[in-house]
Amino acid sequence: MKRIVRISFTDMEATDSSSSEDESPPSSRRRGKKLVKEIVIDHSDPPEVGKTRFKIRIPASLLAARNTTANKKKFRGVRQRPWGKWAAEIRCGRVKGRPERIWLGTFETAEEAALAYDNAAIQLIGPDAPTNFGRPDVDSAVVKKQDSDASGGASEEVV
């Protein structure tokens, strides 16, 4: 299969004769010369893909880093610090039109940070809060804590 590419352009500097501009009448306008160039491309025998592409060598350290970041499970409210530790924070309420951020801490593993997020979400939002590890059964300790906070009595610590 052949393809033809036509390129047309006007060369304003080209002239049809070798005479100088001084000999032409002053009222004549310079139009230039229109040129057309055709390029024929033959696609009958396309090159093999494997032979035309470059082989790029990626260092093993970059491949390992890319694979570990791709395989990491992302948790809600959890992010990894550049030095490897995991940070957890939760956003709730509104301060100046933006969600208020509550810092939950820095943890050694993503799972620990996700668990801290889940506990904070259940305490702040309630048992229907979106969590990382599913919907846990409502623990009696959480209910006792909410009841004691509402009544103003001594609060129990929930672990």
Curated annotation (Swiss-Prot):
Swiss-Prot/TrEMBL keywords: Activator, DNA-binding, Ethylene signaling pathway, Nucleus, Transcription, Transcription regulation
DNA-binding region: 74-134
UniProt region (Disordered), positions on chain: 1-36, 128-159
Compositional bias per record (Basic and acidic residues), positions renumbered to this chain: 136-148
One record GO biological process: ethylene-activated signaling pathway
GO molecular function: DNA-binding transcription factor activity; transcription cis-regulatory region binding
Subcellular location(s) of the protein: Nucleus
Domain of life according to the entry: Eukaryota
Pfam families membership: AP2
InterPro entries: AP2/ERF-transcript_factor (IPR017392), AP2/ERF_dom (IPR001471), AP2/ERF_dom_sf (IPR036955), AP2/ERF_ERF_subfamily (IPR050913), DNA-bd_dom_sf (IPR016177)
Record-linked PROSITE patterns: AP2_ERF (PS51032)
One GO location term (cellular component): nucleus
Keyword Transcription appears in the UniProt entry: yes
Described function: Probably acts as a transcriptional activator. Binds to the GCC-box pathogenesis-related promoter element. May be involved in the regulation of gene expression by stress factors and by components of stress signal transduction pathways.
Family assignment from sequence similarity: Belongs to the AP2/ERF transcription factor family. ERF subfamily.
PANTHER family from the UniProt entry: ETHYLENE-RESPONSIVE TRANSCRIPTION FACTOR ERF069, SHN SHINE , DNA BINDING / TRANSCRIPTION FACTOR
UniProt-recorded name of the protein: Ethylene-responsive transcription factor ERF069
